[in-house]
Amino acid sequence: MSIDGLPPLRDVIERHGLQAKKALGQNFLLDLNLTGKIARSAGDLTNTAVIEVGPGPGGLTRALLSNGARRVVAIERDERCLAALAEVSAHYPGRLEVVSGDALKTDFAALASAAGGASGQVRIVANLPYNIGTELLVRWLTVVDWPPFYASMTLMFQREVAQRIVAEPGSDAYGRLGVLAGWRTKARIAFDVPPQAFTPPPKVTSSVVHLEPRATPLPADVKKLGRVTEAAFGQRRKMLRQSVKSLGGEALLERAGIDPTRRAETLSVEEFVRLTNSV
């Protein structure tokens, strides 16, 4: 038995005949010491509801529950994993709800409300499937209601994506993702995870990112900000007067008080907000 009284994860995947599917962006994390570290990176989980995406055979799920989460709602698209997750649920009666479905079609705000946590009580903790991780993060960063339905997000990404999330202006990694994350959250990389921690091992290093919502982000229309960053970074090597030409070009930049010869990667989050509010 493992430290939580359940079978080792390698035994679980062997008994259930589970193999990670590349089409689903799966890489199973089998080291319970590592899943425990991820759970602890999310903060004190005592009496907290947690939403998890892509639990697979339940390694992180087990860590969340053993670290005190009052309730975990786990969304799993792969029906092959449901039997293994049912065993975890039986070990923690009444504390794990497994939702069989597609995370991209999930109403997370409704899910959080049903989990019994008002805003500030629900945390998102997940080893996100690589093929949908960025899309999910953007959705969570751009929810209309703010403060959002989550108190924090602790998420695993490929390190290259993680670096884009926490990137500062002027760096090669800085782009739309960094602007959105910096606008609405305080984001940091908690730690890196080597490929050999996974089954099968991916070709790249992964990173766990912790994001906490800002109570009062600078006011801006989220859809407009999306259009501005898309235009600006769509031609990131060009001067802003060219890259945002479709939004008003030099006249827009003049209203925002921004030098039209600058490039998108040099603008701070505050300047992007100013630009957005000038559209």
Swiss-Prot record:
It is found in: Cytoplasm. It catalyses: adenosine(1518)/adenosine(1519) in 16S rRNA + 4 S-adenosyl-L-methionine = N(6)-dimethyladenosine(1518)/N(6)-dimethyladenosine(1519) in 16S rRNA + 4 S-adenosyl-L-homocysteine + 4 H(+). The gene is rsmA. The keyword Cytoplasm applies. It comes from Mesorhizobium japonicum (strain LMG 29417 / CECT 9101 / MAFF 303099). This is Ribosomal RNA small subunit methyltransferase A. Keywords: Cytoplasm, Methyltransferase, RNA-binding, rRNA processing, S-adenosyl-L-methionine, Transferase. S-adenosyl-L-methionine binds at N27, L29, G54, E76, D102, N127. Coiled coil: none annotated. Belongs to the class I-like SAM-binding methyltransferase superfamily. rRNA adenine N(6)-methyltransferase family. RsmA subfamily. The keyword Manganese does not apply. Its EC number is 2.1.1.182.
